[in-house]
């Protein structure tokens, strides 16, 4: 489900579920978490200074595997733990965004410290198409990376963010391919790791990880337990537009 290659101080982790557009099921989440943890382990045989994360095929990650176990009770906790591990590792994670990053795939891309984005890639949160709600961190981080106005368009209308616009907003640091991300990572391995670790920690401790306000949690739970979520799933199977009722 994942491939790992090591070139001196750069570990490249590749999501390998191209038949499902690298959609995240629990097994893939766990494999990815273990790989990231291994990179920062003191017991690791090779010293890793930078992680590069990419996807196999033409899609970076299509999001949660809605035809798999994405609605399992423990799925959100597994995803949160993966994000926590990526946040906690001392080395930078460079996302080589080789194609669309959608839903949970966009969350994964935002959890990366830097992003090199393919020209034909795009970012999208289609939650309003499925009746779902996002956690506060995802909304805050999106706003910090693309600006408040563009974040509103992406969240309220499921608007796509193309690579060229992503470069303008800061969601993309560079436009390029996996090789470009790996070359940049190789450059970073020559920089001072403790200075990088400090900067990453301060940047990530920006207040975006917060306890949801009671009203936020109420609306979040209301969305996830609504009939609209069921309607979206049924409509997807029946290949028709959903008829949302707001209930």
Curated annotation (Swiss-Prot):
Its EC number is 4.2.1.17. It comes from the Bacteria. The keyword Lyase applies. It catalyses: a (3S)-3-hydroxyacyl-CoA = a (2E)-enoyl-CoA + H2O; a 4-saturated-(3S)-3-hydroxyacyl-CoA = a (3E)-enoyl-CoA + H2O. SUPFAM superfamilies: ClpP/crotonase. InterPro entries: ClpP/crotonase-like_dom_sf (IPR029045), Enoyl-CoA_hyd/isom_CS (IPR018376), Enoyl-CoA_hydra/iso (IPR001753). One of its GO terms (molecular function) is enoyl-CoA hydratase activity. It is an enzyme of class 4 (lyase). Keywords: Fatty acid metabolism, Lipid metabolism, Lyase. GO terms for biological process: fatty acid beta-oxidation. Could possibly oxidize fatty acids using specific components. Belongs to the enoyl-CoA hydratase/isomerase family. This is Probable enoyl-CoA hydratase echA6. It comes from Mycobacterium leprae (strain TN).
